[in-house]
């Protein structure tokens, strides 16, 4: 039995010396150490040995098994290292070749339009003011002369956090905060995100950008409002653009108006976009309501002012001819790469 074990050991050593691959190593392991391997068969037959022979043969068998296992392990490591060396030699890198460029992003059309609008108003002497997106009812509705029973206060239009807190539905609250904290003269714009309880479709989104403006000083008239907005329209869309004002109603301005501009698709000749009228609604505006001034501790007998507001998303869509607002929020590089 001991002689047989020595023969198995020597046979395994000779085979391992000529082994060149992992598959060959695995075949040798199975031949000698597998369930039906030669060494395994001997170990299973030890029950037939005498009590004196059993520990002696068992010791030799375990030594042979350990030796074969260790030799296979070392051979496997050697083959692995050789394969790695060959792979590294074949995978040489030409460091003189140019690397792959990272994809370059594009500025979002909303960002481009917001920046253009800000630059125009800053050049006209306006400052930029900011405020919280989670707003008190007082600033979002009450101080703006919007009564408790106004439809805009309904849950179908407004996201309520609790009875006293809402996600701002407009950036007008920033105007109120500015009038509370600053003394006239005031000349500011308030760009930012606003929230409405709208279903998503081609022209509506529950989140969009708005920019509102406010001027308060002594002797401010509707002519000042008209001149400011006409100048903005020409700088934004070119000198050929025409504008007109239509009477309207807003709780926080009196008198109120909406300003239309010649259609950017048909240049005022009439098309599907402007529904054949040649005009597109651009923004809402008006003279600040006396009660709004009083709510901010500004005497309407001494000061007057005008306010205006427009959806930035709408401006983007008109400027670039985009017909679906959802494109502005989908982060689709095929769309964004066009700007």
From Swiss-Prot:
- InterPro entries assigned to the protein according to its UniProt record, in alphabetical order: aa-tRNA-synth_II, aa-tRNA-synth_II/BPL/LPL, Phe-tRNA-synth_IIc_asu, Phe-tRNA_ligase_II_N, Phe_tRNA_ligase_alpha1_bac, Phenylalanyl-tRNA_Synthase, tRNA-bd_arm
GO CC, alphabetical: cytoplasm
- Which cofactors? Mg(2+)
Thylakoid recorded as keyword:
no
Extract the GO molecular function terms from the UniProt entry: ATP binding; catalytic activity, acting on a protein; magnesium ion binding; phenylalanine-tRNA ligase activity; transferase activity; tRNA binding
**PROSITE patterns assigned:** AA_TRNA_LIGASE_II
Tell me where on the tree of life, at the top rank, the source sits: Bacteria
Keyword line: Aminoacyl-tRNA synthetase, ATP-binding, Cytoplasm, Ligase, Magnesium, Metal-binding, Nucleotide-binding, Protein biosynthesis
**Record's cofactor remark:** Binds 2 magnesium ions per tetramer.
Kindly state the subunit structure of this protein. Tetramer of two alpha and two beta subunits.
For this entry, the protein name equals Phenylalanine--tRNA ligase alpha subunit
- The UniProt gene name for this protein comes to pheS
